[in-house]
């Protein structure tokens, strides 16, 4: 049974559930290895919890948000934990990319963000933009 929440919720404002890195990791890594013991998965597979997978998910929802602050920003690196985002069917899903300003504000991302010439901050800016270009349908570049 697959419930299409996009159709069922069409008369309401569009809600973008924020996909956490932990959630994406469970979906992505399970595609390549037994990351979660199968006895702990109540339905045929972990993929049934992937709302971006219209064919195998228990429910489907077209819209989501994902933050660069949770992402593997090296787009040339194989990252199984990112499979839910990187290998999604882009014809049946839409992802808004957040630029990761919270990580800047909390000091998680190194660099002098007030200095437009800081090499560390500039490298991160370039990574975020490349990541958004590669995997997001729309990006909010507000604070990097």
Outline where the language-model segments fall.
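Non-catalytic, usually N-terminal nucleic-acid engagement modules in DNA/RNA processing proteins
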Residues: 1-144
